[in-house]
Amino acid sequence: MSSLRTQSTGGGVLGLSSVGSDRTGATSTAAGSHSHSHRRHHHHHRSRSAPRAPEKPPRKRHLNPGHSIASIPSQIKLSMLNSGLISFATEELGSSMSTTLPTAPTELSQFPKLCELRRKFPVLYRVEFQTATKVETHSCRHAMKPANKEKNQNQRCIPYDYNRVVLDPIEGEPDSDYVNASYVDSILKPNAYIVTQGPMENTVTEFWRMVWQEKACCIVMLTKTFDFIKVMCVQYWPASKEKDEEYGGIGVSVLKEEELANFHIRTIKLYKKNENDEITEERTLLQFHYTEWHSHTCPFGNAVLEFRRRVRAVVGSTIKNESGPMVVHCNDGGGRSGVYLAIDANMELAEEEDAFDVFGYLKKLRQSRRGLIENLEQYKFVYDTLEEFVVCGTSWFPVSELSQRLKQKSIKNPTKMNEYQREYQQICKQTPRFTIGDCAGGHRADNREKNRDVLVVPPDNFRPYLTSFQGNSYTDYINAVFVDGYTKPREYIVTEWPLRHTCGEFWSLVYDYECAAVVVLCVPPPGSTNFPSFWPEGKHSKKYGPVFTIDHISHNHYTNIKTWIFRINKKIVSLTELMAGVKAPPKTVQLFQLTCWPMGHKVPTSTNSLVELMNMVERWRQRTDYGPVAVVSPDGRSRCGVYCAANACIEQVIQHGEVDIFQAVKTVRRHRPQLVENMTEYKYCYDLVLHYVLHYLNKDMNEKK
């Protein structure tokens, strides 16, 4: 670290050796050289008899206590740290920074202010993180044994000797007591968790031995088995319900699996048998597998909070739980595991004492295992997620309370805002903002003309990339974004009505992503040149772009709804694909058009027709392997969000008997902030779900039975 020093000058300016020292030194040298040259030139013309003025001794630079770091007001000090004028180091700042570090748990009512201060001065995150992670290290002798090294994913995340999980040894097998796992305390309970690495081919047996021995209450898995062309963790449970697996004398079978957009929940049975192949003991536990948390990234906070809610709904509080610890793992038992523990333990503290202790718990985590919360971004994510929990609170409620809740939400409080307005205002505050750089693909010169509105452009991370080759003048771009549903990620693809020169791209989207259905939520004026027809209206075929030909198969017209079934034919024009003999099989899609939502209207004229259309789409998808749904509106922003959010809520009602429109709307706005763009659309989402519950729910539930 560069040292910090003060210069006692007339103005009392703070001098910093770490700021511009090279440049200052170079300037001083140049100036000194110039001055010396000038003096020699001046002496040459001076009278020999003129007495030479004595040179003043250089002014001593010394540390003035009045100008020390400690004397600088906190706000100025933070600004200097934040702008890089001074660098953070414990030995430099000493006790002067102690006031910025939390010394006790923060009350929930004060936590948003704490987060706001850190957003204003992001350096505070770094100060906390660097301070908390400078903890005393402990011996890892067992993990470093030659026989055990091959049982570790890497040498960065290994257990300390003092709190490692010790397996019951197997007779005749030295070091069979080792597994890369550590006991970790929560804030309120010792040994509440076991943090371990994702099992490898040679450690699956040790993993299940540990789960059985410790009587684990559940398994929380925070990684995909395969991510970014790398095996992160082997699949340590049976691939199908029909086949059991055995690991070290422990039988493992999957009884049930439930899929949601961001995670899966598996019910797993463990059992042991005797010599006669009879089951002598069996247990059931749940595995909660978060599937949308990629390595080196942070997921969406509301999705992690929902995941944690599902875990705790089954497991209960760790304080009251009499069963064994919760087993938590990511790929190496490091960063992601630490993030989950920090969120879970702090929320449990909030439930008991209305407080969070993020900084204090990070110190405890790092004393328990190396690498828990491994970088600054993950530490910020913990803060952001806990703040979201405080600000948003609990927004779900049982479907049985829906009518009563909607009446309460309409009542205005003293601020003249009702609950709908407060919720929508909060959603707008938390909607992500994307920069032009985030949406670079849509702003490229060759793609700019493919957007109806240059302000509504998809982020590159969340847009579908077209893969069908249509010629050298075509790119992989279409103005569309993925939107998560309730049970599936990227369940919807939201897009705008195609322009005349983008109809080929639209059908490429439907073909490349195997969309089961296309939902069109408007009827343009007849003969409109701004909204060209992009499907064959009659019983004939039509070509769109150089590659796609759409064949009419059948059509039906109902009250306020029209449907067509089309066959999409693709012509191979890529020389590489032709030489490789690539085939492009035709694909079938059904297009649904809602005809009761006129242009210029904020909501349709018939709520029942829109709900009926949703049901028709769902029935069609059940027959076609649940491909994504392409949702089309005039501008790709209005109407689509209502359809996606209401659909997700209806699925939540069916699956779990719950309603959470607030979180559903937050979810659809993650990738396109303009979705559900006003209060009218937000309120209409509630109306759609209420209509479904009152008129369709019982009938649909009976059909599923």
Regions found by a protein language model. Name each.
Residues 1-705:
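Cys-based phosphatases of the PTP/DUSP/CDC25 superfamily and their flanking regulatory architecture
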